[in-house]
Amino acid sequence: MRQHRQFMDRTHYLLTFSSSETLLRLLLRIVDRAPKGRTFGDVLQPAKPEYRVGEVAEVIFVGANPKNSVQNQTHQTFLTVEKYEATSTSWQIVCNDASWETRFYWHKGLLGLSNATVEWHIPDTAQPGIYRIRYFGHNRKQDILKPAVILSFEGTSPAFEVVTI
């Protein structure tokens, strides 16, 4: 049996670790952070106001590590593309991250900051109309010496129009 080392932190909590590697792993865990003045899911780069069939709509959001969503079932997808239906005055999902027309890219930054880029390669079959892109994720928050908390968030792009050629 390995001998345990005891460490005292500045807040006077007694911690017991079986190895220095465990302490290092605890200290190196980086939580997700949003840029100052922003929250997770905020749009950093909106879509253009208008696209034609065959073009790529792209939106960049304040993101978080996608690994945080593995154990959480709040949302069943990282993204949706939705079309506004005037007759029902509601948004209808036309595709998600399982669709061939969509792409999701996570860009890891420094010190827990990251972005998520969502692309929709607008297919020839897309109906003209008003669309938006939504992003769903989970951010990891952890205070020193406390267990991590996983929080869900979502972001929605401003509406944009798809027109036919």
UniProtKB/Swiss-Prot annotation:
Give the top-rank taxon of the lineage listed in the UniProt record for this protein: Eukaryota
GO CC, sorted alphabetically, is: membrane
Tissue expression pattern: Ubiquitous. Expression is reduced with increasing age and in late-onset Alzheimer disease (LOAD) patients. This reduction is even more pronounced in patients with an affected mother.
* GO MF annotation list: N-acylsphingosine amidohydrolase activity
Name a single GO biological process.
ceramide catabolic process
Write out the similarity annotation: Belongs to the neutral ceramidase family.
Task: Read off the PANTHER family from this record.
Answer: CERAMIDASE, NEUTRAL CERAMIDASE
- In the UniProt entry for this protein, what further remark is given in the free-text comments? ASAH2B/ASAH2L is a partial paralog of ASAH2, resulting from a partial duplication of ASAH2 on chromosome 10. It has a polymorphic start codon with a single nucleotide change of the original ASAH2 sequence plus other putative translation start site that might lead to several potential ORFs.
Please identify the protein, giving its name as recorded: Putative inactive neutral ceramidase B
- Which taxonomic lineage is given here? Eukaryota, Metazoa, Chordata, Craniata, Vertebrata
